[in-house]
């Protein structure tokens, strides 16, 4: 794995298929369907516009021959425009930073956990030990409601936290992009554990009064890698609806993942998950290339769910008292290695190499292992480590806090490629590659790293 992974990072992984022969088995039927949709749309356009344009060309050639050449050039450019599929552009993104009164230090965490009366001495000591080794600093954010005596997970607390982080991220994004919500055609929202009725995506539509024909999707139960899945779904929808905007929102709700029992197998996630959310605005409008920050280059999804060990490595469980919590098996690191190896093999040849890497900031141990396995430099890991330290594990939105860090440090230059990697239950490893379309200046407003 190390040899293959290092090749990919430093110069790309060469395709293993025979030279010159397409790997038809690698194609998914959804792309065939999208191809048919694109072909039908293109045929309809040519049927409407080609005949009158040909008549115009014949008329000009006969009576105004001096204009024949520029008109021919125009026709060629027009045909090229319609025959070339539009790319998916990332206009901007925003990461929510909760208010300062929700900051929590490690000592505050332990003190509040003790005062809650929900944990015995063994549970307290375990959480203290995990916190000390977590890589999380003294300024991450947590809802205080989870430390209430006798606290049990409930929808009211979950909805309140969801509204805070989701609306906060979207408000900042809309202010930065200046896009009217009525122009948003597609909405994709992912949240792992909290799944409400009406859905969180419906909550967004109601709050912002989006159009009645908005293509809305709510992804749940897909873990920390669901942010990349949401981007993939939005990409396919943008290809089907050319010239549209897509809003993608990624979050996890801490007050709904919190475990208030004493089962030692369910306690560690308490020490890692922190509040956060990211909102991303995508576009398939060609004209938006000139104001977009990034262009989507490649996206690969890997699912190891066919293997029982992978499938059961992360799951939501209940203890004997009926309290739910997240279980993470001891095999998860090895499962993650195999998933990452498969993802890298599928990613194929990428040249030039990546200038920047954003690895899901789940824990210090995970980052250390990826650092070692892929033979990365400290600079490669800087964004992930700083994000874990400052914001903790914000789940699927973590990779966006990392990209925000790179922008804050003015590291994203025109032509740079950034590789975002997410891991999640199932077990899944998903990654996406973006290319910077311009030098990204440090944002003055919608960046969580601004003081």
UniProtKB/Swiss-Prot annotation:
Query: What is the first-listed, main subcellular location in coarse terms?
Result: membrane
- Where does the chain cross the membrane? 40-60, 63-83
Active site positions, chain numbering: 224, 303, 356, 393
Q: Which GO terms describe its biological process?
A: fatty acid biosynthetic process
Localization per record: Membrane
Q: Induction of this protein: by what?
A: Repressed by herbicides such as flufenacet and benfuresate.
Q: Which reaction does it catalyse?
A: a very-long-chain acyl-CoA + malonyl-CoA + H(+) = a very-long-chain 3-oxoacyl-CoA + CO2 + CoA
Topology relative to the lipid bilayer, per the entry, is: Multi-pass membrane protein
Q: Which SUPFAM superfamilies match?
A: Thiolase-like
Pathway entry: Lipid metabolism; fatty acid biosynthesis
Q: Name one Pfam family in it.
A: FAE1_CUT1_RppA
Q: What is its EC number?
A: 2.3.1.199
Give one GO molecular function term. Answer: fatty acid elongase activity
Query: Where is the FAE domain positioned along the sequence?
Result: 82-366
- UniProt record similarity statement: Belongs to the thiolase-like superfamily. Chalcone/stilbene synthases family.
Record-given protein name: 3-ketoacyl-CoA synthase 15
Which organism encodes this protein? Arabidopsis thaliana
From the UniProt record, report the name of the gene that encodes this protein: KCS15
